[in-house]
Amino acid sequence: MSNSITSDQIWQPDHVLALWPTGAPQAQGSGVLHEPQLTVHLPPVAQANGCGVIVNPGGGYRILASDHEGLQVARWLNQYGIAAFVLRYRVGPTYPTSVSLLDAQRAVRLVRSRAQEFALDVNRIGMLGFSAGGHLALAVATKGDQGDAQAEDPIEQQSSQVNFAVPVYAVTNGAKRGRKADEYTPTDESVNPQTAPCFIVHTHEDAIVPASQATLIYDALLRAGVKAELHIFNDGEHGVGLAAGDPDVAEWPKLLLRWLRRRGLLAHEERCAVRGSVLCAEQPLGLGWLTLIPKHAQHPIARTFLHKREGGEFLIAKENGPIVGQHTLQIHWISQQAQYDGSGRYSLERSLMYECAVDIVAGQRLDIRLQAHDFV
């Protein structure tokens, strides 16, 4: 029995976009290795949420791992309503990484220029990359521009700034890595307060790109006040992609979805501020949490910490607020003590929870009045 794959079984992209239809700048020849492009992978129309991600396969700026770091990632994103665009960027030794960056920036401009066609929100376009592709995503995130308003090419008038970046086991600084400093420019040194928020993934076991490359960029983002989340898994070789064979490391795509949701990147509706109060027997809780979990699976969760010193009042700022509509409200009461001391005394044997359905309305207060027996 033959397991060979025939030519008509090889997957073909939905749609291909040449980055420069009339020829790429600095091209050293013709053919696939000299003609950068995007393959377009769109979710079902009814499922699309307006978020778009450009996917950069890795390969050390020499090859492109286009299956498990390209197509398969795009199809996974599509399952969650996210439009995906796999980038074929030019690689060495023919092309320096400055040309790869030129291709990636052009890809962002091209996607943004056709946002209406692809039902995208121009403020929710990100870049996800693996290894060298992750370095490329960070280079774009730290070197974006607003476009050239005077350019004859309308695509060049578009911004190359991404709204978020996802570097996965990425090189972030070649010099500090100790290899190929000329190819892997120091992205950490280019981080500034305008750098896009980042979701960073790495593994401790990576013997090709050490996990210190991930902490390097995270520390730079932290210093600059840029929103970032870092996950370093113990297990996992370099190049795991979505990590289909490792149930633990395979949690990172799920964590990414949660991060995108929490940042409001999976919803087109505007967030709102929520002000209100929580009292139990007309008294504020010592310490607790108020959490708003939306009925819509892709709307962001909102929450705030409750402290007795606020007299039961709370405010969730618009930036971190919910989207109007139906939510499950949870109040977690974790201590009757508003201020711990050195006595080590206990006030609650376990955290207590109250839950109910609420309808969030912009500008309307959320005042909750409870009794101790309402908690479980």
Where are these regions (language model features)?
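C-terminal catalytic histidine-bearing segment of alpha/beta-hydrolase fold enzymes
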Residues: 41, 215-271
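Short beta-strand element of the alpha/beta-hydrolase
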Residues: 49-58
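Catalytic nucleophile-loop/oxyanion-hole region of alpha/beta-hydrolase
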Residues: 65-67, 72, 87-122, 243-250
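Primarily recognizes the serine-hydrolase "nucleophile elbow" in alpha/beta-hydrolase
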Residues: 106-193
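Short beta-strand/loop motif that positions the catalytic acidic residue
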Residues: 194, 199-202, 206
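Conserved alpha/beta-hydrolase "acid-adjacent" motif
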Residues: 207-216
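Short, acidic Ser/Thr/Gly-rich low-complexity loop/linker segments typical of extracellular
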Residues: 297-316
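Extracellular beta-sheet/turn segments enriched in Thr/Pro/Gly and aliphatic residues
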Residues: 345-376
